[in-house]
Swiss-Prot record:
Heterohexamer, formed by a dimer of trimers. The hexameric TusBCD complex contains 2 copies each of TusB, TusC and TusD. The TusBCD complex interacts with TusE. The keyword tRNA processing applies. Belongs to the DsrH/TusB family. Its main location: cytoplasm. This is Protein TusB. SUPFAM superfamilies: DsrEFH-like. It holds the Pfam family DsrH. It comes from Buchnera aphidicola subsp. Schizaphis graminum (strain Sg).
Amino acid sequence: MLHTLMKSPFETNISFFSGMLKKTDDFLALQDGVLIALIDNIFLKKITFSSENLYVIKEDVYARGIHKNISSSFILISYIDFVNLTLKNKKQIIW
């Protein structure tokens, strides 16, 4: 399953959301959701514990000027890669 976070993690119930993630699920952060990938943020431990497949849209990361502060647990991908994730995952949840 693909879990997509588009809003800031401060506007989302991360405890509930991370409880829904399985280790094999794909997690993608885009738009303001990329803030969840910042090093040392309060949500990082919950999300890295919940899923092994963590992605952020690199265009959104660079647009916010945070590319040097992204956790190494996350893989930067393009919007084309995002399309491939949607093809891979028949089920999706947007948070």
